[in-house]
Regions:
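Flexible, compositionally biased loop and terminal segments
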Residues: 1-201
Length: 201
């Protein structure tokens, strides 16, 4: 979805011209996927730039995040339209948890709202989309975890599509955990040194 009329107005752009610009930006990645010589089976995106967009547009940071959430719904439509079975969104890294609490509260509220909405979304059930969340859930508030459980439980039986949301997730931490796990297996005598290869990692 394109930013609301007030956002375009604040940027000195008419609502109609804003719609044209938004559609032009949206059509490019969609066209690239459609014209790719090989079928795309996994689309992964990083939810980044909402704050910068808000600052440049001179709107509240919270509104920038909400516009980003709306854009995600558009991308989900693309995924279903193009029949891409795996869709992953990197929404919140562990590093992001150091942001001001006021901004985190806005994000957590959006996650709760989004997870509960998607659990009831007709598109999700009609297309049998399994929703799963990965990351360090112990770092998230209880109400966010409750929304995660709700969305996962409502879609647990589906397997046609998999929609993964990364919350409180960090790739560096994941690599560290993998290294620690391999070291523990080796120390216990369950994994010989010469057996540690790309497959083990």
């Amino acid at each position: 979805l394109n930013p609301p009329a007030q956002v375009w107005a604040d940027m000195g752009i008419s609502e109609r011209m804003g719609d044209v610009l938004g559609q032009a930006v949206e059509s490019k990645p969609l066209k690239e996927v459609q014209e790719h010589p090989e079928k795309v089976t996994h689309l992964a995106i990083i939810m980044d730039g909402n704050r910068r967009f808000a600052w440049k547009s001179k709107i509240a940071t919270g509104l920038g995040h909400r516009i980003g959430k709306q854009k995600l719904e558009t991308v989900l439509d693309w995924v279903l339209e193009l029949n891409i079975p795996w869709f992953t969104v990197y929404a919140l890294s562990t590093e992001n948890l150091t942001r001001p609490q006021e901004e985190l509260d806005i994000l957590f509220k959006l996650y709760i709202e989004g997870l509960r909405d998607i659990a009831e979304d007709e598109r999700i059930h009609a297309n049998e989309v399994k929703v799963q969340i990965i990351g360090r859930r112990e770092l998230l508030p209880e109400d966010v975890n409750e929304a995660i459980d709700y969305a996962e439980n409502k879609t647990a039986a589906y397997d046609k599509y998999v929609f993964t949301v990364c919350l409180a997730y960090g790739s560096r931490e994941e690599m560290l955990n993998a290294i620690q796990s391999i070291a523990a297996e080796h120390a216990a005598g369950d994994l010989p040194l010469d057996a540690i290869d790309e497959t083990a990692v």
